[in-house]
Swiss-Prot record:
Its main location: cytoplasm. GO terms for molecular function: rRNA (guanine-N7-)-methyltransferase activity. S-adenosyl-L-methionine binds at residues 96, 101, 119-121, 147-148, 166. It is found in: Cytoplasm. InterPro entries: rRNA_ssu_MeTfrase_G, SAM-dependent_MTases_sf. This is Ribosomal RNA small subunit methyltransferase G. It is an enzyme of class 2 (transferase). The gene is rsmG. The keyword Secreted does not apply. SUPFAM superfamilies: S-adenosyl-L-methionine-dependent methyltransferases.
Amino acid sequence: MIRLLNNFNFSEIDNADPAQWCRLFQEAAAEFDVLLSDAQLNRFLMYYRELKFWNSRINLIASAESVTDIVIKHFLDSLTLIPCIPFPDGRLIDIGTGGGFPGIPLKIALNSLKVTLLEASRKKVSFLKSLRRVLNLQDMKILNERVEDLITQAPCPNRFDMVVSRAALKLPEYLRFGKELVSSHGVIIAMKGANYQHELEDVNDILEEYGIFLAEVRSLALPCTGDFRAILIFRKSLSRT
């Protein structure tokens, strides 16, 4: 279990002291063995500011969320996936990315990652395209599309090394989509909370039908909040051989 950073208080540094903001964020990320350069830290700070600005116009995150909520529950929560990324320069798709989570934090931390963000909301896509320009992120595609429509395209886009999502998809539905998008050697990563075991029970009977298996479960606690997270890693069954 990850050590909790109960002494961190991001709410005291809301835009007033960018250097301190970056320092504290760097220390928190290091708890997950994520080392960030000054350029990466500045990108996260710019991301935070753009998120706050756009959130006053469109619903990207809850309007009442504090600086601590944004940094911990969105930025750092996304970065917890880094140890689970088997191909740092591979192709990753983020289904229902919303405000860019977890895809954009992963892209900032792993610059060689080739990221595709999938989002059905036009307003959110406008934000994502603006953010891509502001942060000068390369090798990042943004698709204004529903995953249901994407998987029906011909030929089926079975081309991603990693499929991730923080969207509110039930696990059976997410795996149904994920199996159509992931490559034969790739992984489907599900980010879940404390009730993940109940969701696993719902998919036990369909994993064989889908041709996938649960390869690994990683559990951790987010800093400051102590919120429990379970990262479920699925692979295609043929990768066992």
